[in-house]
Amino acid sequence: APGTYPYVLMNYTDDLESLSTLAHELGHSMHSYSTWESQPYVYSDYSIFVAEVASNTNQALVRDYLFRTVPDRDFQIGLIEEAMSNFHRYLFLMPTLARFELAIHERVERGEALTADAMMALMADLFDEAYGGEVEMDRERVGITWGEFPTHLYANFYVYQYTTGISAARALAEGMLTGGEEAVARYTAYLRAGSSLYPLDALKLAGVDL
């Protein structure tokens, strides 16, 4: 909340995945802190749509720094694997969960019951479609994926914003790494904007037109 220090709530296990997660969560914290320091109370919050951009931009910048400064081959392979796992999560898993969420809302609106078996079958079908039938799946294991994200699915239509977030973040990180101080200034202005701008306008301020 405004007037307090931002906090990060996570389990840190001293590995690359935890480091990446810490970078992600610190992106949220710095976004909040920058907004609180720059905006009046009425504009001191921001939407999830822009929040997931700041967190993923932080991750992208940390990965680039580590890739350039740690020459160890095994470490770099691990870094690439972590990045690809993150892209899979946000470009395949989250859009599929978003489709699942829409489908179960539509079923409820039609008066249909939601059973665990029906939801697992739907989840597995959506993943099979997402992978184009090219991946052999354990349908029972994949089908329960929705059960791993209760906090996200209880916040209506949250998860698709991870996909837009990482897409915008990659563009912004690349812009700052190649565009110098002007790109950094645009990004900093976006972090400070809070809800004083509509989400798409805030991203335009940063340098991304979605």
Task: Give the residues covered by each predicted segment.
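Short pre-active-site segment immediately N-terminal to the catalytic Zn-binding motif
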Residues: P2-A23
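Extended, non-catalytic scaffold segments that flank or surround catalytic motifs
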Residues: V42, L61-Y65
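Long, charged, glycine-rich C-terminal linkers/tails
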Residues: A1, L9, R141-T145
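Short beta-alpha connecting loops at secondary-structure transitions
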Residues: Y7-N11, S38-I48, L79-N86, H105-R107, ...
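Conserved acidic
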Residues: S18, Y46-V50, Q76, H88, ...
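C-terminal, non-catalytic "cap/extension" segments appended to globular domains
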Residues: L22, M30, T57-A60, R68, ...
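Post-HEXXH active-site segment of zinc metalloproteases
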Residues: S20-T21, S32-N56
